[in-house]
Regions:
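Short hydrophobic alpha-helical runs that function as membrane-insertion/retention elements
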Residues: 59, 123-125
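Short acidic/glycine-rich beta-turn/loop cap or linker motifs at sensory/regulatory domain boundaries
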Residues: 62-66, 128-131
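Tandem CBS (Bateman) regulatory domains
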Residues: 2-33, 47, 67-68, 72-123, ...
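A short beta-loop-alpha structural element at the N-terminal edge
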Residues: 37-41, 103
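Helical hairpin unit composed of two closely spaced alpha helices linked by a short loop
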Residues: 39, 59-60, 67-71
């Protein structure tokens, strides 16, 4: 019953065989409700949103809803902000274009490799496997590690 609970919690069909991390995809463990900011969000609003969030990186979308990058709190926290600056700067001015992201069809093992290579990153945006401009979720390093532990316990 533990295996079935694991499957259902990840949204994996019961006929899909899980033997290794290669059998679990990022889309199975990602969080689908993602807070995003529009590219024209003012700097002071960005600070407000980040300060009330558990995430330190925020996905930025353009007016069409396409994923264009992330704003990373570590990049902006040291900026000395005067009131005029905070009204002039918007998200698209400080966005990191083409950020590190995962594709929804990547395996759990591939996701772990990305997090191992970038140990300073705790969350990654997940984009559609076919359309890399479509943001479909977010996955944390803890989500990946927790799924690995559950898989290891299941196999022992």
């Amino acid at each position: 019953h533990v295996v079935e609970h694991f499957r259902s919690s990840l949204g994996i069909p019961s006929h899909h065989k899980i033997k290794s991390a290669a059998d679990i995809l990022v889309q199975h463990i990602m969080r689908k409700n993602v807070d995003t900011m529009c590219e024209d969000t003012h700097f002071n609003e960005i600070l407000r949103l980040i300060s009330h969030s558990k995430y330190d990186r925020f996905p930025i979308v353009n007016k069409e809803g396409d994923f264009i990058g992330v704003v990373d709190y570590s990049d902006i926290r040291d900026l000395v902000v005067d009131p005029a600056f905070s009204q002039l700067v918007v998200a698209k001015d400080i966005v990191k274009p083409e950020p590190l992201s995962l594709h929804s069809d990547q395996t759990l093992g591939e996701a772990l490799d990305v997090f191992r290579s970038h140990s300073n990153i705790t969350y990654l945006p997940v984009v559609d496997a076919e359309n890399h401009k479509k943001l479909v979720g977010i996955v944390s390093q803890n989500d990946v590690l927790s799924s690995f532990r559950t898989l290891e316990n299941k196999n022992n």
